[in-house]
Amino acid sequence: ISILGCGPYQRQVMDKRVLITGIGGFAGGYLSRHLAQQGYLVVGTSVHDGNVIDGAVEILKTDLRDMAQIKSVVDQVKPTHVVHLAAISNVTHEDVREIYETNIVGSRNLLSALAGLSVTPEAVLMTSSANVYGNSHREVLSETDELNPANDYGVSKLAMEYMARTFARRLNLIIARPFNY
């Protein structure tokens, strides 16, 4: 990543560098713009070529399932903060194997690469999903409600949460369960 650590970005890079995985998705663009306005140097990853996102200095084509790729990105960026948005998020996605490989193995690859840094990020936000609760008919859900995923996407996100906890002693993890409705 040629732009990192040189020119006018040097001071900014030394202070706050955020890596947003899945920057090309719904939330990535909004978050990138907001963080750039707050003074963060934003670098994103996407499995797709050609993404242009406001606020992002660079977007790197990266498949989180490829440990060498994500390790290279993490080693170059040395993020102070990470927002992990990358996932197969369509509950009707037909390739079930891809759901599990991306949402669990890809997430583990990211956490492993981050844990291997000499200076680990101040915070790593892992996005799970309210789908871990399943088809609850309650109007208001609590984090203490029963976890009962009703599809492969929900199961993969719950498994990702449990896997992420194995890194809790090495990384400052935050796990969020957002709703999209």
Question: What are the language-model segments listed below?
Answer:
Residues 18-36:
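N-terminal Rossmann NAD(P)H-binding glycine-rich loop of SDR-like oxidoreductase domains
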Residues 156-159:
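Active-site helix of classical SDR
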Residues 45-49, 64:
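N-terminal Rossmann-fold cofactor-binding loop
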Residues 129, 161-181:
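Conserved beta-loop-beta element that borders a ligand/cofactor-binding pocket
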Residues 21, 45, 82-86, 124-129, ...:
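SDR active-site strand-loop-helix element
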Residues 56-66:
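Rossmann-fold cofactor-recognition segment
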Residues 64-102:
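NAD(P)H-binding glycine-rich loop region in Rossmannoid oxidoreductase-like domains
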Residues 108-152:
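Conserved Rossmann-fold NAD(P)-dependent oxidoreductase catalytic core, especially the SDR/UDP-sugar
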